[in-house]
Each structure stands twice: as C-alpha cells, then as structure tokens.
From Swiss-Prot:
The lineage of its organism: Bacteria, Bacillati, Bacillota, Bacilli, Bacillales. GO terms for biological process: aspartyl-tRNA aminoacylation. Its EC number is 6.1.1.12. This is Aspartate--tRNA ligase. Belongs to the class-II aminoacyl-tRNA synthetase family. Type 1 subfamily. HAMAP family: Asp_tRNA_synth_type1. InterPro entries: Aa-tRNA-synt_II, aa-tRNA-synth_II, aa-tRNA-synth_II/BPL/LPL, Asp-tRNA-ligase_1, Asp-tRNA-ligase_1_N, Asp/Asn-tRNA-synth_IIb, AspRS_core, GAD-like_sf. One of its GO terms (molecular function) is catalytic activity, acting on a protein. Signal peptide: none annotated. The gene is aspS. It comes from Staphylococcus aureus (strain MRSA252). Gene3D superfamilies: Bira Bifunctional Protein, Domain 2, GAD-like domain, Nucleic acid-binding proteins.
Length: 588
C-alpha cells in the first residue's frame, strides 16, 4: 500500500502536473460510457478523479465495480479541469486527478441513507444509530474540524497566560444542590456510591488553596436532568480558576480568550469591550437573564394604563402589585390574523400568563379585542410609552412580574424568528452581572443558591445574609452569546466562617455541612487565597460558532432527548453477577 500524498480536499492547482496518491471514500460515481468520474471524499473535502482508458484501461475496469462508500486508494496525475467543468462550489473545483491505478481497500454495503451532502433530510434517530456514517458528511466533518480549532485556540491562549492544565477526579462524592447526580456504586465499599462530577467546582477551588494560582481543564461533566435541544447528560466544559483576582480580572481574561477564538476560527475581529448589563436590567428590558440583543423589541412598562384605563384586567393587575408590559412588533399588524394571535396566546400560557392582550395601531387609533377600552388619552399614553406607529402590533401581558418577564421574553424571541428580525451573521456577546445570590424555593420552603453555594456575596451585602437574604447580590457574572448562556462564573467564598454562614442560610445544619463539605471547610483553615473563575460550555460555543441549531451536531456520539445512545443502545441491562458484586438488586 502506497503512502498518501495529501488529503482529497486539499488537492488544488498547487499540485498541477504532480503524481499523487489519495485515499478515501467514494462519495458518488458517474459512468459516462467510456469515462467514469468519481468524487473521492475524506475529512478535508472532495476531489474529482477521472478514469480514462487513455490513462489506464485496468483502472477503468476496476472503477466500474466500485460503489458509494467503498474505501479506495488511487494514484494519478493532477490536471486542470476543462473550463466548462470547473466546480466553484468546492476548493478542489479547478482540478481533477487522471487515475492510473486504483486499489479497492474495502467494500461497503448500501448505506441506510445517502452520505451525499445534498441529501440530509433523514430521520435523526437513523442518523444517530449509524452515527459513524453520519459523521462522514462534509457538513459535520467541518463542524468537528472547527471544534478542534476552537479547543486548540483556547488551550493556546490559556497556556500563553500561564494556566496549568490539571485533571480532577471523575469518581467523586455526591453533594446536594444543583441537578441530580449520576451515581456509580462501589464494589469495594458495600452500599456506598461515587458520583460523576456536575463540574469540578470544589476541586478547582482546592487547587487554588494548593497554590497553583491559574488552572484550567477542558473536562467532561455529567448532569441527570431533563434534556432540551441545548442540553446533554454529558457535556464538555472549559473550566477556569484564578487566585488573587477580582471580578474584573476574570471577565477581562474570558473576554480576551473569546475574542482570540472568534478571530482565529471565524476570521472576525471583535473591537471594544463586550457590553454589560445587570441581571435586573436584563430582566426588565428583555424578560430574560440571557437576552438576545441582535434585535430590539424590548419589554416596555405600561403599568400606567392600569391606573388610567377602565379595563378590569389591567386595573386588577396593578391593584394587586402586578405589572403590565408590552412589546411592539413593528409593521406586523397585517401579518398576524386573529387565529395567529390565538396561537400566540396559547404560547404565553405555557409560561404562566393568563392571556395575551393586543391591539393593532391604525391611522385613527387602535383596533383589536381591547381597542374599545382605550380612550383618546389612553391611546396617546400608549403611543408615547411604546413609540408604536400605524401598522404596528402591540401585545400586552398583565400579571406577576416574573410571569410577565418569562412570557414576554419568550414571545419576543418567537416573534423575532417569525418576522425574520435576527441577523444570523452577528455575534452579540454580553456580560450579565450583579446576580441575586439566592432564590427562594416555594416548594422546599427554603433559599437555594442562584448559581452555587460557593459564590461570594458582594461585600456590602454580607450583612444581609442574616437579615434579608433575598436582597443580597452575588459577585457573579454570566457570558451570553446570541441569547444563549455560554458560561458563568463568580468570585468564590474563601473564608470558612462566611462559607458556614452561607450553608446555614441554605438550610444546612452544622452537621450536614460538615458531612457534605467538611473537606472544603477544613481546607479554608489553612490559608485560602481570594479566588474566582468561570466555566464555558464548549459544546454550546461550538454550536453557536458553527451556526448549528442542535447541540447534538457538535458532539461526536451524543445522546437522544431521552438520554439514550442509539448507536450502542446505552443504557442497558447488566448481568445478575455484576449486580451481585455490587450488592444491588433491581426493583421493578
């Protein structure tokens, strides 16, 4: 077997006149009677190879037998294509290879779906079952090439900045808070379990206490939670921690790293600092803690109408400490029928809204179901507050503030997609800062950490832990890209007494805190430096930089929405002997 000269997708005019050897898969084959054209494919792309009896009758005979997905080796001379056959759609479209020798390395059965890039309308379950075939598609091959480039760029940046790549345990201790753990039973210790890490949070803090100063890891994390299009049970995290830093230091580092990645893999220069917005401002203006700022349509407080109008829904809402907010779809009045508005009402119902009020602005006033409740002065108030003009569609939700934010925030994004308002070429990064430290869980009747229990409160708010915990703000920051939470970080608690106080506010007894986190509390006794960090979702970053819409397309062997692997049929049953060794019994 000859050595490969280069990849198929890299054969350009630089190789003209050269004898080369290529190896790859038959993408397709065209028999023109006396001449056979084969598109040969590998991870770098496709090149056309030609079987002409003038060059080799024997090679032509073998080419007559090859079919799609055969693995072949060809040798031949690179020549320029005739002008009328040039293919500008591919990098190799100016050239072709006149084959003098071909060897069939391996045959292939007919695949369950075409690998050809033009034929991608295949049920995703079939694609996942035969993932090794799906990954041959050029679109996915390029996605994973970019994933490699992104991780390489991240590693180079962090290495240049003096970070150490340090691995942390995969088998660790199950701790409360956050999502459910994946548990691993111990054979050696009867009835005891390890947990797969949801993140290396505690270990990276311990590494700071160990004196390593700058740590990073591109690490697998595991969360047993309900899946969405942008969630997987196992995912990859760019985990970073630094000592002797404040919030500005961490944010600046994260920003510089992301700018470098975007420039190197997308060729896009991001000038200036990323915009910043407080959590409260994001919720007020966009109804989301991860707002998509590629389009406007902000939420507008029109609670004044509830005080001025004789409309019971609005009036009752304001009297019961609720609020009324509106969004304006510019020029969309004629695009949405009453039936469409009924569908939008059902949509906001999902988020707890009791209804969706709406009006259409016309030259002489308002039309729509609640238009008759607007007196002339109410119309003027509405137009002044919202800036709405003739032809605009104005939608209202009147409810508790959190319901208003969630429902209108989601509706805003839905409308933007339907109306084509989103510029898909934009990369809008945004920092969201000044997060609440705690949230109150109505079901559990206790406070829970908004991020995690190790996030430090703002220094001015430490006293509030004992008096008004819900008012305390955190030294926390999230990085958002195009409406997706790309990552989050915080300055950590590094004082044992403050950490114990935090556990107390979260409802832990001293005994429970010691049992679950005693190793961390003990470490704080031996000189813990101030430290903080950030964790970025690598899969999600790849998804956004490759313009994919599904996280599964960025993971080589992903799980389905029901957390199964269709390729290997995992999870699966195990033998009685294995269960016995683990002292386990399955109860159905």
């Amino acid at each position: 077997m000859s050595k490969r000269t280069t990849y198929c997708g890299l054969v350009t005019e630089a190789f003209l006149g050269q004898e080369i050897t290529l190896k790859g898969w038959v993408n397709n084959r065209r028999d023109l009677g006396g001449l056979i054209f084969v598109d040969l494919r590998d991870r770098e792309g496709i090149v056309q190879v030609v079987f002409n009896p003038a060059f080799s009758e024997e090679a032509l005979k073998i080419a007559e037998t090859v079919r799609s997905e055969y693995v072949v080796e060809v040798q031949g001379t690179v020549t320029k294509r005739d002008p009328e056959t040039v293919n500008p759609k591919i990098k190799t479209g100016q050239v072709e290879v006149q084959v003098t020798n071909i060897k069939v390395i391996n045959k292939s059965e007919t695949p369950p779906f075409s690998i050809n890039e033009e034929n991608v309308n295949v049920d995703e379950n079939i694609r996942l079952k035969y993932r090794y075939l799906d990954l041959r598609r050029q679109e996915l091959a390029q996605t994973f090439k970019m994933r490699h480039q992104i991780t390489r760029s991240i590693r180079q940046y962090l290495d240049d900045e003096g970070f150490f790549d340090i691995e942390t345990p995969v088998l660790t201790k199950s701790t409360p808070e956050g999502a459910r753990d994946y548990l691993v039973p111990s054979r050696v210790h009867d009835g005891e379990f390890y947990a797969l890490p949801q993140s290396p949070q505690l270990f990276k803090q311990l590494l700071m206490i160990s004196g390593f100063d700058k740590y990073y890891q591109i690490v697998k994390c595991f969360r047993d939670e309900d899946l969405r299009a942008d969630r997987q049970p196992e995912f990859t995290q760019v985990d970073i921690e630094m000592s002797f830093v404040d919030q500005e230091d961490v944010m600046q580092m994260g920003e510089e790293m992301l700018k470098k990645v975007v420039k190197e893999v997308k060729g896009v220069e991001i000038n200036g600092a990323f915009p910043r917005m407080t959590y409260k401002e994001a919720m007020r203006r966009y109804g989301s803690d991860k707002p998509d700022t590629r389009f406007e349509m902000e939420l507008i407080d029109v609670s004044q109408l509830g005080r001025d109008m004789d409309f019971k829904v609005f009036k009752d809402t304001v009297e019961n400490d609720g609020e009324i907010k509106a969004i304006v779809a510019k020029g969309a009045a004629e695009q949405y029928t009453r039936k469409d508005m009924d569908a939008l009402t059902e949509f906001v119902n999902i988020y707890g809204a009791k209804g969706l009020a709406w009006v259409k602005v016309v030259e002489d006033g308002l039309t729509g179901p609640i238009g008759r409740f607007f007196e002339a002065e109410n119309v003027e108030t509405l137009l002044t507050l919202t800036g709405a003009e003739a032809g605009d569609l104005v939608m209202f939700v009147a409810d508790k503030p959190n319901v208003v934010a969630q429902s209108l925030g989601a509706l805003r994004v839905k409308l933007a997609k339907e109306l084509g308002l989103i510029d898909e070429t934009k990369l809008n990064f945004l920092w969201v800062t000044d997060w609440p430290l705690l949230e109150y869980d109505e079901d559990a009747k206790r406070y829970v950490a908004a991020h995690h229990p190790f996030t430090s409160p703002k220094e001015a708010d430490i006293a509030k832990l004992g008096t008004a915990p819900e008012e305390a703000e955190a030294n926390a920051y999230d990085i958002v890209l195009n409406g997706y939470e790309l990552g989050g970080g915080s300055i950590r608690i590094h004082d044992g007494e403050l950490q114990e106080k935090m556990f107390e506010v979260l409802g832990f007894t001293k005994e429970q805190a010691q049992e679950q986190f005693g190793f961390l509390l003990d470490a704080f006794k031996y000189g813990a430096p101030p430290h903080g960090g950030i964790a970025l979702g690598l899969d999600r970053l790849v998804m956004l930089l490759t313009n994919r819409t599904n996280l599964r397309d960025t993971i080589a062997f992903p799980k389905t929405a029901s957390a199964t692997c269709l390729l290997t049929n995992a999870p699966g049953e195990v033998s009685d002997k294995q269960l016995e060794e683990l002292s386990l019994r399955i109860r159905h």
